[in-house]
Amino acid sequence: FYYFCYGLTKNMVIAVSVYTFFQMCLLAGSVAYFISTLRSHKIRPFVLLLITAFYALIPYHAVFSVTVWKDIPFAAAVLFFSCAILRLSVQNQICLKNLAVLFISGVMICLFRSNGWYAFLLALPFLLFGFRHKAKAVYPPLFAALLLAAVVKYPIMSAFRVEQPDFIESVSIPMQQITAVICNDRYLTEEERALIEEVVDLTYIRDLYNPTFADNIKELVRAGNQDYLVSHKDEFLNLWIALGLRYPGDYLTAYVNQTYGYWYPDSFYLVAEAEGVSATDLGVSHTPLIGGPLVIKTKEIAIKLGSMVPIYGTLWSMGVACWVLLFSISVSVIRRDYHKLICYLPGVALLLSVLAATPVATEFRYVYFLVLCLPFYLITAVLPEEADAPV
């Protein structure tokens, strides 16, 4: 969008504005598709209004709609994909529109975030099993999404010299666990210490180690000899396993410190407090059409209310979103609606990918897809079997 519009207008502000408008429409479209899905299931208008209010009145949705991050269209793709699964499985709406949504949103999930690719691969076998009775209709868009994403991700991106995340990005948690063992002055054999020192200088590792933030140690590895780590993966895997068996408490503590924000309910995170355009020399500037102190103060209060109002503040908690997902799955199991479990697959697979490789303990945008899909998870758990039975 940016390069196309810039080529037409030669104006960077217009090009960025067009992309921002597209992102706003994409996010709004995903919500509209969700509401339409519920309407087709005869959900009561009052419930639909409550869900609409969640998206319209919670301020971080509005701020994120104009925030140029890949996490925002990614979250919209997850909601599209989840709703398409609901339509195709529970509602049995096999049509070209829903299959097209499944395909396009599947490609977006695979390409917009690196963990999305792995989550899609993790969920795919279960999706294939869940749709085994509708294989002729559903399998083609799923495999087509996988094939197109693989072609774009590897040969095309390689041809255009698009850099993929380096290896250390995918091993943030094991790296933090090994670092915790070192910083706790645990015993290491001479061979283990020598292997680690082939990659990093241990002189300042205690000063750099942050239990909730892996970037310091990642940069230490990059400043050292990351190539040695990549070429000796087996040795470092054995080292990680050996230290884990020897010091399980250190590993568990390091893991909790690195991931608690995504599953601990009392983990408020100030969201969307920064708005505007970061200072650059590219000519893009923040030019609000509606300004004034009243607007600014209203926005500030709306954002800060999450830290002031107890129940309302749970909507700012990533941990609460995680437990809502688990609660919804539990309700479906208790009600013996096992066929609905397939609708939770994208969220579960993506959450597991975050918990397996997050570089920071609290980052709302990493699990914004979970928050955007909150009403979907809750309403899916209580959907009646018959489409004409209102909720």
Model regions: which residues?
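Transmembrane-helix motifs of polytopic, lipid-linked glycan transferases
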Residues: 21-42, 80
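Membrane-interface anchor segments at the N-terminal boundary of transmembrane helices
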Residues: 14-18, 253, 257-344
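Membrane-interface alpha helices of multi-pass inner-membrane proteins
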Residues: 98-113, 124-125, 144-150
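Membrane-proximal stem/loop segments at transmembrane-domain junctions that anchor or position
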Residues: 162-291
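Specific aromatic-rich, kink-prone transmembrane helix
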Residues: 74-91, 104-106, 123-124, 373-377
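Short acidic/glycine- and proline-prone juxtamembrane loop motifs at membrane-interface regions
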Residues: 63-73
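Short helix- or helix-capping micro-motifs
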Residues: 48-59, 79, 106, 110
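Loop-to-helix entry region of an early transmembrane alpha helix in multi-pass inner-membrane enzymes
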Residues: 7-29, 64
